């Protein structure tokens, strides 16, 4: 007997690629089931569709299933019969969603997308300006289609008068016409091949870049037409397809009226005008009338395809523009984003959430009524299987009546059946998690408090949605991958995300505090039980200091075990917590005051040492304890808890006195307005801080008498405890409650100079309240804007990274990035240990003695990074997503550790989306503010020296010095740094040293804490000479390039260089200080920048190290620093900053002053032979940081300004660029205290570098200076290498995330992101193919995404497909060999084991793989 089972397989999803192209009139007719000839829709009396109308049943199919229109044929037995009376085929009514019709247009009509979507394809193809094409189309001008023997030119436009004149002169020797027919003829007549040859010749010959660019654009368009098989005349339509009627429905609403889709109106207009035109042509109407009708037909079709693209939009009866076909697919409400990328799903519900303090971490409370509705199908089947009901109908009735048995069955159904909970907005993957439902009374969903952080939920009325996974596979995935107990770590940072907050923290803090002289102090207990008994009987106080004997086993991270035994000093509260501490963790973790950070450490340590299961149990127990003791503590907020300090009034009086003095000084013109304002702001800030400090003193300490002795102890004030423990509130808020509110900001960020001296306990006066509304209101407005902006940033990030998936184990590269600690302002902000964790080494790590510590390819875990630290390694090379060589994906080695799972990332992980979510999710926490570092914000003191914070050795980097006549070492280099390393050689500090600084110590010297290693003048940058000689001033002319000022008080006179813009004449003078020797030969020339103050006079003698001039630093530093969200967006969009720094494009020597123009200065870079290699023109106002004759390397700064990432990549290389983006982006997040792993930012940067520009096309078909996907270039190079031909040379180009998303290989992904019309227009002309590689494309067509379990399924089905081909099985059969099938082999033991204990088991992953392998999708 044959063991194969054959059955029909209606699988419409069996396609690998999707292609989009232009439709020819024949193709449109082949789709159609008939021509729509009348504009009528339905008969007003019978409500039946009119024949040949827009809803005609003959064309589109029957209205009722298997029933013709007149009712002659009914039921399934007549299927396929065409009724001879009404002409309707007996078929299912759903064919009305699929069958299309068509309209035969009397005259051709141009498709508006190819005309008006910029750049106009028709205009470009015909090499005509869009304006001229439109003139012809809309019947304003004639166009010459065939000049014949006349002097007219082809494509020449003629007005009516000119046309009449030409007819008079040449008769019918030439042809000229107007309208779409003319355009169609021109398109059809174009000989593409000869045009291409002409253009190539033109491209080669032309010198101007503009001409070249135009030629290449047109060439590309013609080549696509040649290659794609599209004919250009198809951009002009002669047949218009009609959408199936059920996609543009007409529905009756109450009151006998009808609601209709706008498309019906638009189609009606087209049909009306088309029919009228037909009549007019039959009647041989005058040309002018016909012409007008043709123009109106063109406009009607334009409106149908894309309303509002040209001229005014056609409006409906409600004065709103009608929604055209283009509007149906684009935008948030369009087909792509509304129905294809996100759909409403069945088996879901939503309700308000409340807190479930008694739940376990993997549970949620589900209201009974809701559960019954959600699990209805399961309940029905159980009722039938259990014999309670014989039919579904009966089961339905039982459920409706809510009989007792129904609830029992519901209990068994939901047992072990996870549900998904989701809270909008879902900003990262933890916004949807799986829980096991517990049935509860009431109507609100109960949520476990510890998952609130991941969902960003609170219980002030938030709602959440519940979804039921139906299939076994989906339940398995929910349990293994999405269960809340499996998502302990945040994928963004790798830190625990289920750490306790708020009341839990308060409770744990309260019971771990100690109190002097509490009842039972000093007693010794032998065990936890003794303490518990004594506490419950009331003989000891919970805060009493006691001694406790302990004996526990402790594991460390390396897996070693040691014993912890002996008597420890502790408190009763801490001893009570000992019961919940699992075996393996040290009591020292608990034996301290537990503030939020410490609790987080306990969870972290538990996860590292004991694994997920024990951590989950511990977290739950900590939560129960926290809730219990915060309730028992009775901590609450009362007005008396805010203690106002006694010295507040005195402090305020003192401040007011100082301000009075300053105002008097200002009135007698001793200080400027700016100084007055800054001083007042400073005084109030200082006072406010002092009042705050004395309030903290008052609130944080209590005086108690113990045995008649007065003692100061830490206070048990409720407000203080809340803030101190990290449960709620902050020092700043407390200051406003009990100190003084202080300074308020205006919406533009500046401070209002009248401070609010009252606090909330005293209450504000009307004026004070009014002052404070300013900032408060801005805060609210900001929040609203910020949320939208952050959401948009996330969307752009997801879009650019969505198709980045780990697709192989190892790409084999030894490329990578150099990692060292991140140092800001001389302090190590992020140690190397943190950055290196979870990365793969790209090169061996070698100690100073030359010993190989770790080999390349090692994945660094916690123990290995400690090893790096112990050996004083301060720089390593790690693999990075940016340098990964895998094409169309990433390899697991370059990505490193999966942060949420603590092991190397799995093949199939969609790391792109995770990266995008990790960066976008904290976006809402980032500020929107643009900081102004002038006036109020810069309350910091100016720094003028560097003191060492760690003892060790100093090392100079890029520092050149000269010795002046006082014997001091003066720095004359620009980008110098001093590095302080400790005894192990690890970098502890790194300081930038400005030019002109005095360095008292030499490189390599030992330093102690507090030693000064550099001093400088903070207010001016000195220009210093490194040669001795006589001064000659050139072009320093008083009143023209400089101004003399004489100070009456000091008797000093100064010479200051003035700006070019202030000069009326002599704009080309360049003030310079030249230093010459005795013979008058020039030794050095120093150009003087605007604002420089001279320190030397003409003919004076200079020594080495003398200051020639000083540039005051006031003007240059007051630039705006963009912070927060806008800065992150700016980095990822790779925007070029205004007045960016100019980098040197090559190595060489700088030559200045040659051939300057009126407005610009010219920088020439010359090689050893004196030839000019590069020239740069700059406005004269830009300040150069290089001198004439200075040697520069490629990428050195020539003129300062903000960094341009594009230049950085071009001149300094990939590594410098990657480093810049990483450090800049991280500094924004660090300011807000958000931790994001570097690899997420690197992942996005990889996607920004997807394209490259061709430097030399080699033997390929590419064109020089064209930018193309890097993957395509690499694939082309592989081919050329095999053939032994010349390869393509290229250089990477940087694209912002929006541009990168729009230029992806997949047109479906790009079209569903932004600019849908443009993307589809371009794709259709190119006959573009979408290979459906990314996630988005697969979601759009309703497939499993090729990542995670979907990738496994895809590989599996590829194997099956291969087998089918080898066996020669036809497509419409599924061939299953049952001989080898044994159902008992499929093991679900791991799911069984969960029944014993509901906490997650590691074996499940194995079972998931087995299950997926054994399931043939």
From Swiss-Prot:
Native source species: Francisella tularensis subsp. novicida (strain U112)
Role noted for this protein: DNA-dependent RNA polymerase catalyzes the transcription of DNA into RNA using the four ribonucleoside triphosphates as substrates.
Alphabetical UniProt keywords: DNA-directed RNA polymerase, Magnesium, Metal-binding, Nucleotidyltransferase, Transcription, Transferase, Zinc
Lineage: Bacteria, Pseudomonadati, Pseudomonadota, Gammaproteobacteria, Thiotrichales
Name under which the protein is recorded: DNA-directed RNA polymerase subunit beta'
Coiled-coil parts of chain: none
HAMAP family: RNApol_bact_RpoC (MF_01322)
Similarity field: Belongs to the RNA polymerase beta' chain family.
Any one Gene Ontology molecular-function term assigned to this protein's record: magnesium ion binding
Cofactor binding summary note: Binds 1 Mg(2+) ion per subunit.
Residues where Zn(2+) 1 binds: 68, 70, 83, 86
Gene: rpoC
Highest taxon, organism lineage: Bacteria
SUPFAM superfamilies named in the record: beta and beta-prime subunits of DNA dependent RNA-polymerase (SSF64484)
């Amino acid at each position: 007997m044959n063991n194969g089972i054959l059955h029909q397989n209606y699988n419409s999803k069996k396609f690998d690629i999707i292609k989009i192209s232009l439709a020819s009139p024949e193709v449109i007719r082949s789709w159609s089931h008939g021509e729509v000839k009348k504009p009528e829709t339905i008969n007003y009396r019978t409500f039946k569709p009119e024949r040949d109308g827009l809803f005609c049943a003959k064309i589109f199919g029957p209205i009722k299933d298997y029933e013709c229109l007149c009712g002659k044929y009914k039921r399934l037995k007549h299927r396929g019969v065409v009724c001879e009376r009404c002409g309707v085929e007996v078929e299912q009514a759903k064919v009305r969603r699929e069958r299309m019709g068509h309209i035969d247009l009397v005259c051709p009509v141009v498709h508006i997308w190819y005309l008006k979507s910029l750049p106009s394809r028709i205009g470009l193809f015909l090499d005509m300006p869009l304006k001229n094409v439109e003139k012809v189309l809309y019947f304003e001008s004639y166009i010459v289609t065939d000049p014949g023997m006349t002097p007219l030119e082809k494509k020449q436009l003629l007005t009516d008068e000119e046309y009449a004149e030409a007819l008079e002169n040449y008769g019918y020797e030439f042809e000229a016409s107007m309208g779409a027919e003319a355009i169609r003829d021109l398109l059809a007549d174009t000989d593409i091949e000869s045009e291409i040859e002409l253009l190539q010749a033109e491209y080669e010959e032309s010198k101007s870049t503009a001409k070249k660019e135009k030629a290449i654009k047109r060439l590309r368009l013609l080549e696509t037409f040649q290659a794609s098989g599209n004919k250009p005349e198809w951009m002009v339509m002669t047949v218009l397809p009609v959408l199936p009627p059920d996609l543009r429905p007409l529905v009756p609403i109450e009151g006998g009226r009808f609601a209709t889709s706008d498309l019906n109106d638009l189609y009606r207009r087209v049909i009306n005008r088309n029919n009228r035109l037909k009549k007019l042509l039959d009647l041989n109407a005058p040309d002018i009338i016909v012409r007008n009708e043709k123009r109106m037909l063109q406009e009607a079709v334009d409106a149908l395809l894309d309303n509002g693209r040209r001229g005014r939009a056609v409006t409906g009866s409600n004065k709103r523009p009608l929604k055209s076909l283009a509007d149906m697919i684009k935008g948030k409400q369009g087909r792509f984003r509304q129905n294809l990328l996100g759909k409403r799903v069945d088996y879901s519900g939503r309700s308000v959430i409340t807190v479930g303090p008694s739940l376990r971490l993997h549970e949620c409370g589900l209201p009974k009524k809701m559960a019954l509705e959600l699990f209805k199908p399961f309940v029905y089947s159980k009722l039938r299987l259990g014999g309670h009901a014989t039919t579904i109908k009966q089961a339905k009735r039982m459920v409706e009546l809510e009989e007792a048995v129904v609830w029992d069955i519901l209990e068994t159904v939901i047992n072990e059946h996870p549900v998904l909970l989701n809270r909008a907005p879902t900003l990262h993957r933890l916004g949807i998690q799986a829980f096991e439902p517990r049935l509860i009374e009431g109507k609100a969903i109960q949520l476990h408090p510890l998952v609130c952080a991941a969902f960003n939920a609170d219980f002030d009325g938030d709602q959440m949605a519940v979804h039921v996974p139906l299939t076994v596979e989906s339940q398995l995935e929910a349990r293994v991958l999405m269960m809340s107990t499996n998502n302990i770590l945040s994928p963004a940072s790798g830190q625990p995300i289920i750490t306790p907050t708020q009341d839990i923290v308060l409770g744990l803090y309260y019971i771990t505090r100690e109190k002097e002289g509490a009842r039972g102090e000093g007693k010794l207990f032998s065990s936890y039980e003794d303490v518990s008994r004594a506490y419950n009987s009331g003989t000891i106080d919970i805060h009493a200091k006691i001694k406790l004997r302990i004996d526990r086993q402790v594991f460390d991270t390396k897996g070693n075990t040691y014993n912890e035994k002996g008597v420890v000093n502790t408190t009763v509260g801490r001893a009570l917590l000992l019961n919940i501490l699992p075996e393996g963790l040290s009591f020292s973790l608990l034996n301290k005051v537990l503030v939020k950070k410490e609790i987080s450490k306990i969870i972290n340590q538990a996860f590292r040492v004991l694994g997920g299961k024990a951590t989950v149990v511990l977290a739950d127990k900590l939560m129960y304890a926290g809730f219990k003791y915060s309730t028992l503590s009775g901590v609450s907020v009362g007005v008396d808890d805010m203690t106002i300090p006694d010295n507040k009034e005195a402090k305020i009086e003192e401040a007011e006195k100082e301000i009075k003095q300053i105002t008097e000084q200002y009135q007698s013109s001793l200080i400027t307005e700016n100084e007055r304002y800054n001083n007042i702001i400073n005084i109030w800030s200082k006072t406010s801080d002092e009042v705050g400090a004395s309030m903290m003193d008052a609130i944080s300490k209590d005086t108690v008498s113990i045995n008649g002795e007065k003692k100061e102890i830490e206070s048990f004030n409720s407000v203080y405890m809340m803030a101190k423990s990290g449960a709620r509130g902050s020092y700043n808020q407390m200051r406003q409650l009990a100190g003084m509110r202080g300074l308020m900001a205006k919406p533009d960020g500046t401070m209002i100079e009248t401070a609010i001296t009252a606090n909330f306990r005293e209450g504000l006066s009307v004026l004070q309240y009014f002052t404070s509304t300013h900032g408060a209101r801005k805060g609210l407005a900001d929040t609203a804007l910020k949320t939208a902006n952050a959401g948009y940033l996330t969307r752009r990030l997801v879009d650019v990274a969505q198709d980045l998936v780990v697709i192989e184990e190892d790409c084999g590269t030894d490329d990578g990035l150099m990692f060292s600690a991140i140092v800001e302002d001389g302090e190590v902000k992020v140690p190397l240990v943190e950055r290196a964790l979870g990365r793969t080494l790209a090169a061996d790590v070698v100690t100073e003695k030359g010993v190989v510590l770790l080999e390349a390819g090692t994945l660094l875990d916690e123990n290995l990074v400690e090893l790096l630290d112990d050996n004083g390694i301060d720089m390593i090379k790690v693999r990075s997503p940016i340098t990964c060589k895998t094409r169309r994906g990433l390899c697991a080695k370059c990505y490193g550790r999966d942060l949420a799972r603590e092991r190397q990332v799995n093949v199939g992980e969609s790391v792109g989306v995770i990266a995008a979510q990790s960066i976008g999710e904290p976006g809402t926490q980032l500020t929107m503010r643009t900081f102004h570092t002038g006036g109020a914000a810069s309350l910091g003191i100016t720094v003028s020296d560097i003191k060492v914070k760690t003892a060790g050795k100093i090392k100079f980097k890029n520092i050149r010095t000269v010795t002046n006549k006082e014997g001091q070492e003066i720095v004359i280099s620009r980008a110098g740094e001093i590095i302080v390393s400790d005894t192990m050689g690890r970098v502890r500090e790194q300081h930038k040293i400005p030019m002109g600084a005095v360095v008292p110590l030499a490189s390599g010297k030992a330093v102690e804490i507090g030693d000064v290693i550099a001093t400088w003048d903070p207010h001016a940058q000195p220009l210093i000479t490194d040669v001795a000689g006589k001064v000659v001033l050139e072009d320093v002319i008083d009143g023209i390039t400089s101004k003399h000022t004489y100070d009456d008080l000091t008797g000093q006179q100064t010479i200051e260089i003035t700006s070019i813009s202030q000069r009326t004449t002599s704009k080309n003078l360049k003030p310079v200080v030249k230093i010459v020797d005795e013979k008058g030969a020039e030794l050095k020339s120093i150009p003087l920048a605007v604002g420089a103050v001279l320190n030397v006079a003409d003919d004076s003698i200079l020594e080495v190290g003398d200051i020639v001039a000083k540039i005051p630093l006031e003007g240059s530093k007051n630039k705006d620093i963009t912070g927060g969200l806008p800065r992150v967006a700016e980095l990822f969009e790779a925007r070029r900053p205004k007045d960016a720094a100019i980098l040197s494009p090559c190595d060489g020597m700088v030559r200045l002053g040659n051939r300057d123009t009126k407005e610009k200065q010219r920088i020439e870079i010359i090689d050893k032979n004196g030839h000019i290699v590069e020239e740069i023109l700059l406005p004269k106002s830009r300040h150069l940081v290089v001198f004439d004759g200075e040697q520069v390397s490629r990428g050195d700064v020539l003129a300062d300004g903000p960094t341009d990432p594009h230049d950085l990549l071009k001149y300094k290389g990939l590594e410098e660029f990657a480093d810049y983006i990483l450090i800049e982006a991280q500094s924004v997040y660090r300011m807000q205290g958000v931790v994001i792993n570097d690899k997420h930012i690197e992942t996005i940067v990889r996607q920004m570098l997807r394209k490259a520009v061709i430097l030399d096309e080699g033997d390929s078909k590419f064109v020089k200076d064209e930018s193309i996907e890097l993957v395509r270039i690499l694939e082309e190079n592989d081919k050329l290498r095999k053939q032994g031909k010349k390869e393509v040379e290229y250089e990477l180009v940087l694209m912002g995330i929006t541009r990168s998303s729009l230029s992806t290989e997949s047109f479906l992904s790009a079209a569903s992101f932004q600019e849908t019309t443009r993307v589809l227009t371009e794709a259709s002309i190119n006959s573009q193919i979408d290979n459906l590689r990314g996630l988005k494309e697969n979601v759009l067509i309703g497939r499993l995404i090729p990542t995670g379990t979907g990738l496994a399924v895809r590989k599996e089905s590829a194997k099956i497909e291969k087998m089918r081909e080898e066996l020669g099985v036809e497509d419409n059969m599924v061939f299953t060999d049952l001989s080898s099938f044994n159902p008992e082999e499929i093991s679900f033991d791991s799911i069984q084991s969960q029944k014993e204990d509901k906490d997650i088991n590691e074996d499940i992953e194995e079972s998931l793989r087995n299950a997926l392998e054994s399931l043939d999708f």
